[in-house]
């Protein structure tokens, strides 16, 4: 039973889902820790659950295209250094790019804009972030899927 052939497309999809689930668990742990630490140190006033829950989840959904880009790079190259280096080097200027009018062209700034609601002074484009993120996620994931199932096993 365990040695039956497995479809390459299913492997690609399941590995991506597992990667997204691990990142989601990290986000959930962050949300939970913020609430617990707030209670432990005795912060006064009502807990802003909407802000504590919505902002990190918005950033998570806007980061899905980044996860897809790094995933496609990691299955395309045998060396781990390339996707890791690209991911790290691309994340560093994200806050600087998010403060410009060119943020829309830089996927690493999407989580920042989504978490802020797209409410930097000049840029009020919160919903645009999710639309572009969705299209970019579908495009990158589809490209990676097609190249993965056609690739030689060597």
Language model regions located:
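Membrane-interface helix-boundary motifs at transmembrane edges
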Residues: 9-10, 72-78, 149-153
């Amino acid at each position: 039973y365990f040695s039956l052939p497995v479809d390459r497309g299913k492997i690609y999809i399941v590995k991506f889902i597992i990667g997204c689930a691990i990142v989601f668990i990290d986000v959930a742990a962050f949300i939970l820790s913020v609430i617990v630490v707030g209670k432990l140190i005795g912060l006064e006033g009502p807990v802003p659950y909407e802000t504590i829950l919505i902002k990190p989840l918005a950033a998570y959904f806007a980061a899905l295209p980044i996860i897809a880009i790094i995933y496609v790079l990691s299955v395309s190259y045998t060396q781990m250094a390339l996707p890791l280096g690209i991911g790290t080097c691309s994340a560093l200027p994200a806050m600087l790019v998010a403060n410009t009018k060119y943020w829309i062209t830089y996927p690493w700034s999407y989580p920042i804009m989504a978490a802020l609601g797209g409410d930097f002074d000049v840029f009020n484009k919160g919903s645009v972030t999710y639309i572009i993120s969705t299209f970019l996620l579908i495009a990158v994931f589809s490209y990676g899927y097609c190249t993965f199932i056609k690739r030689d096993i060597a």
